[in-house]
From Swiss-Prot:
Residues 152-154 are annotated as: G5. Keywords: Cell membrane, Cytoplasm, GTP-binding, Membrane, Nucleotide-binding, Ribosome biogenesis, RNA-binding, rRNA-binding. GO terms for cellular component: cytosol; plasma membrane. NCBIfam families: era, PRK00089.1, small_GTP. An essential GTPase that binds both GDP and GTP, with rapid nucleotide exchange. Plays a role in 16S rRNA processing and 30S ribosomal subunit biogenesis and possibly also in cell cycle regulation and energy metabolism. Monomer. It comes from Listeria innocua serovar 6a (strain ATCC BAA-680 / CLIP 11262). Residues 6-173 form the Era-type G domain. One of its GO terms (molecular function) is small ribosomal subunit rRNA binding. This is GTPase Era. Belongs to the TRAFAC class TrmE-Era-EngA-EngB-Septin-like GTPase superfamily. Era GTPase family. The keyword Endoplasmic reticulum does not apply. The keyword DNA-binding does not apply.
């Protein structure tokens, strides 16, 4: 007789830039959580759905937990903390190459108050020696009683199959929440805006920080050619940032558009014409009605 089907929700938490989105994208096999080496790139709870014949795991990729500096930061931390209560299992991801940080202390204090089992995932193990890894495991073991401690490399995929096996062992018997071929419950508009935002963050580096939102104004399909026309607006806080994003003779914006278009085409599997505008909206991160307009939901505060 075949084993009963299992399912459950898993939250991925950790300091900014420890590789949470990389891990989610490796497991799902498609780019659904924005990846960039800047802190604070994941803003909304992106759900990735991983389904096999035996089980379905719904992943929730939370924003990096950090002490908030403004309303947007406050919002992001609140989402992450609320998530702990809603899931069946928590992956707490740390970066082996940077070791124990003050941010980890902040997260561990929060995790200690939660009933949910926690897996400690030591990521980027390819960057440290086995001796240092053992020391790190011992250091974290003293801080908290983890359900499992699993060293991985999210980028290379090392030990990820073992992680999924341990995850399945911790799931309860449950239904298939999403159709088998569905990998995320985020509408396509949201993922398209995230792919554009990823390119802005990657290409402009520190010059344009997190004061960037992307709004998809419209998506139209040409019935004859099947080609999609997507109109998007990049929102920044200062006109100097607008200048940086547009670049000399529009070169930077052209680069952003070209790279984002390739990502969007591979996501949607169809040809895309992408038109991007840049707009200045002063201090949008501190104005609630703008946060709502740009996809941040008040109910999650």
């Amino acid at each position: 007789m075949s084993e009963p089907f299992k399912s459950g929700f898993v939250a991925i938490v950790g300091r900014p830039n420890v590789g949470k989105s990389t891990l989610l994208n490796h497991i799902i096999g498609q780019k659904i959580a924005i990846m960039s080496d800047k802190a604070q790139t994941t803003r909304n709870k992106v759900q990735g759905v991983f389904t096999t014949d035996e089980s379905q795991i719904i992943f929730i990729d939370t924003p990096g937990i950090h002490k908030p500096k403004h309303k947007l930061g406050d919002f992001m931390v609140k989402i992450a903390l609320n998530t702990f209560q809603e899931v069946d299992l928590i992956y707490f991801v740390i970066d082996a190459s940077t070791g124990f940080g003050r941010g980890d202390e902040f997260i561990i204090e929060k995790l200690k108050n939660v009933q949910t089992p926690v897996f400690l995932l030591i990521n980027k193990i390819d960057l440290i020696s086995p001796e240092d890894l053992i020391k790190l495991i011992e250091q974290y073991r003293e801080l908290m009683d983890f359900e499992e401690i699993i060293p991985i490399s999210a980028l290379e995929g090392n030990n990820v199959p073992n992680l999924l096996e341990q995850t399945n062992a911790n799931l309860e018997i449950g239904p298939m929440y999403y159709p088998k071929d569905q990998i995320t419950d985020h509408p396509e508009r949201f993922i398209i805006s995230e792919l554009i935002r990823e390119q802005v963050l990657q290409l402009t580096r520190e010059e344009v920080p997190h004061s960037v939102a992307v709004v998809i104004e419209g998506i139209e399909k040409n019935p004859k050619t099947e080609k999609l026309t997507i109109n998007a607006t990049i929102i920044v806080e200062r006109s100097t940032q607008k200048g940086i994003i547009i670049g000399k003779q529009g070169q930077m914006l052209k680069q952003i558009g070209m790279r984002a278009r390739k990502e969007i085409e591979s996501l949607l599997g169809s040809k895309v014409f992408l038109e991007i505008w840049v707009k200045v909206q002063k201090n949008w991160r501190d104005k609630e009605h703008y946060l709502h307009d740009y996809g941040f939901d008040r109910e999650e505060y």
